[in-house]
């Protein structure tokens, strides 16, 4: 488990490229036949990837010991989105078939979660939970899509809301998938911050010769991190989170905090950015 401490905005603005990477970048999300796990002190979110290829991968009691509990989800809820091929997720003996871009919400209290496939790649977010909501599969046909932006401003994109109150109940975790239209490069511009929650972006569906310049920092102290395919970046509440790519791309967003209202944002005008 890779533990990342919280960081003050005044400290963050003094960091060089490697310092920003150490604090915010999750460089390797997927490892064959393993799970990866980054634990952030910011709202206690856990992010990572699960990639069963030649054997099943389980997340259970061994993780619980690192969290001070008996098993991983004793006090947590889990959200996963599959960006690879078909696979299965077995939650306490109940098997769910998970296809490409299917998602699964696993409620607090599930003792054993087992992942199996030959070519799946499952990205996950995990957050503290105060009560148990039912485990539920969400398919792309069941999400709440919204198309925003314009080709003229190169930010035409479709936001697919998987885990939001309109689709299912969670304690605090929200997740979704945003896909840029061909030829569009910008996400979340004009940008915003979230005073009441943090966010993690996971960039994927990118060619090897492409990258995304992820914008972060306070609106008047912006910095950037160069993101490559299948990498994630942590965004504290005080930071903007936007990006521009060399080609169109897709990203999964996950939010944790005290408010699940999607539009609860502190907007920043482009003219006010520095």
UniProtKB/Swiss-Prot annotation:
It comes from the Bacteria. Gene3D superfamilies: Jelly Rolls, pectin degrading enzyme 5-keto 4- deoxyuronate isomerase, domain 1. Keywords: Isomerase, Metal-binding, Zinc. It is an enzyme of class 5 (isomerase). One of its GO terms (biological process) is D-glucuronate catabolic process. It catalyses: 5-dehydro-4-deoxy-D-glucuronate = 3-deoxy-D-glycero-2,5-hexodiulosonate. Its cofactor is Zn(2+). Zn(2+) binds at residues 192, 194, 199, 241. GO terms for molecular function: 4-deoxy-L-threo-5-hexosulose-uronate ketol-isomerase activity; zinc ion binding. The keyword Amino-acid biosynthesis does not apply. Its EC number is 5.3.1.17. InterPro entries: KduI (IPR007045), KduI/IolB_isomerase (IPR021120), KduI_N (IPR027449), RmlC-like_jellyroll (IPR014710), RmlC_Cupin_sf (IPR011051). HAMAP family: KduI. Belongs to the KduI family. PANTHER family: 4-DEOXY-L-THREO-5-HEXOSULOSE-URONATE KETOL-ISOMERASE. This is 4-deoxy-L-threo-5-hexosulose-uronate ketol-isomerase. It comes from Shigella boydii serotype 18 (strain CDC 3083-94 / BS512).
